[in-house]
Design a protein with these regions (language model features):
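Short beta-strand/turn micro-motifs composed of small residues
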Residues: 11, 78, 307
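Active-site microenvironment of metallo-dependent hydrolases
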Residues: 157-173, 177-447
Length: 447
């Protein structure tokens, strides 16, 4: 039996996210044409190549033209895009955006015709800032919906996903029925799902029954009129295909890969500065001669991205502030969106140990203290997913995250999700890919 839920996808528009990194494959317009009519495909996934849209890149335009010609929804990704650049971005045919971090930004996007997806995830928590403005100004909410963007399994278990967003909205003072609209019919209409998202004759009977509109504790769930809990009893387990394993294949590396010898004393180097509760970063700098002392004091960390799909040997090495880890390293093969191996540490030796551990287990999360592995959570499916039962995995996630925080990772920083976004070169202001440190505002590498 199948899961009692409706499952839809938007085809990834940016694989890789930019030409400034290396991913497992390349998704161009020709590939997308082959997949666009597959069951469950609604439209195009978030168009992260903002300069490519604004300045009319030929390949980007082919993708946009394809989905516009079919009348399909096109998801956007426009962090800090304002004014004339926002107008140009929206004019290309993009329908949604989920990157607003303030009410002022969200309001401008609504005025320009975008549907705004209000985000509350693990690393990015923007709902309160946006909905306070919505509530204070009493605006129409028909072009608003909720999203998580990225949420840890453990956070899903402890908080929920969209229900958590509804609860937060009500707690902020939004009328319960208005808040529920964002979670139901608004989302259905934004994505062109006809006769879904409301209780009405002839509409799909996907229902959640609550005992009240404050706590929103589900009493029963129905999918297409069928009790979802009973339907779950008939689910047939699926064994992951063997081809989805063994994907962590970086070229040979050792402790010298992460050595301070790569930094010249007389040069100034860019430093990524993490922000608690955000995936945006700030820029700072440090002189090469000061790096060793800053590492020792915990002011900066070494950070590296190792290409792990094709064994190219590409390694981007840089510096980061604001993580908090003491005497060790953290590494993960979940590194948006090309999912190379990203590692951060207080020493080359610790980073080498962490990266070697992830090659050994073929992907996942790992935490090192000194040069000894403290804990590892294997993600054996493409280095991204686990075949372990959900409850077991939640316990493992909680445990390794708690150990990372106990080793100094700051509150407001998710040890793994926050780190994973440091490799995504389409979110301001400074990132790192397997090709080096990247300024997303200038859309170029920092030499």
């Amino acid at each position: 039996g199948q899961m009692p839920l409706n499952y839809y996808v938007n085809l990834p528009s940016c694989v890789p996210a930019t030409r400034f990194e290396h991913s497992g494959c390349v998704m161009d317009a020709r590939n997308m044409i082959k997949l666009v009519n597959e069951p469950g495909v609604l439209g195009m996934g978030e168009m992260m190549n903002v300069p490519g849209v604004i300045y009319n890149s030929a390949e980007v335009q082919k993708k946009l033209d394809l989905f516009q010609s079919l009348g399909r929804v096109i998801d956007g990704h426009a962090p800090c895009v304002r004014g004339k650049e926002l107008a140009a971005y929206v004019a290309s045919g993009i329908d949604t955006d989920h990157e607003s971090i303030s009410w002022d930004e969200a309001k401008e996007k609504l005025r320009n015709g975008l549907a705004v997806l209000v985000r509350e995830g693990s690393a990015s928590r923007n709902l309160t800032a946006i909905l306070r403005g919505v509530i204070d100004e009493g605006i129409d909410v028909s072009s608003l919906a909720f999203c998580t963007d990225d949420k840890h399994l453990a956070d899903i278990r402890h908080e929920g996903t969209i229900r958590h967003c509804v609860q937060m909205a009500i707690a902020l003072g939004m009328e319960p029925v208005r808040a529920l609209r964002l979670a139901t019919i608004n989302a259905a209409r934004i994505y062109g799902l006809r006769r879904m998202g409301a209780v009405a004759p002839g509409w799909e009977a996907d229902l959640v029954v609550f005992d009240n509109l404050q706590s929103l504790i589900p009493q029963a769930v129905f999918h297409k009129g069928v009790d979802a809990l009973k339907a779950c009893e008939k689910i047939t387990p699926v064994t992951p295909n063997a081809s989805l394993q063994g994907s962590v294949k970086p070229a040979e590396f050792d402790v010298t890969t992460f050595s301070l010898s790569h930094f010249a004393d007389d040069r100034e180097y860019p430093v990524i500065t993490m922000l608690p509760g955000e995936i945006f970063t700030e820029k700072s700098t440090i002189m090469g001669k000061d790096i060793a002392a800053a590492l020792a004091s915990g002011d900066v960390y070494l950070i590296a991205v190792l290409e792990r799909h094709h064994g190219t040997g590409n390694v981007g090495l840089g510096l980061l502030r604001g993580y908090g880890l003491k005497d060790g390293a953290v590494a993960t093969t979940v590194a948006h969106d090309s999912h190379n191996l990203i590692v951060i540490g207080t020493s080359p030796e610790a980073m080498n140990a962490a990266a070697k551990e992830l090659v050994r287990v073929q992907g996942g999360y790992t935490l090192v203290k000194g040069t000894e592995v403290v804990d590892t959570l294997p993600l054996n499916i493409c280095g991204l997913m686990s075949s372990a039962p959900a409850e077991e995995l939640i316990g493992s996630l909680d445990e390794i995250a708690a150990k990372a925080h106990a080793q100094g990772v700051l509150d407001g920083i998710d040890p793994f999700i926050s780190l994973s976004f440091m490799a995504l070169p389409v979110i301001p202001k400074l990132r790192i890919t397997d090709m080096g440190m990247f300024d997303t505002e200038e859309f170029e590498f920092i030499k």
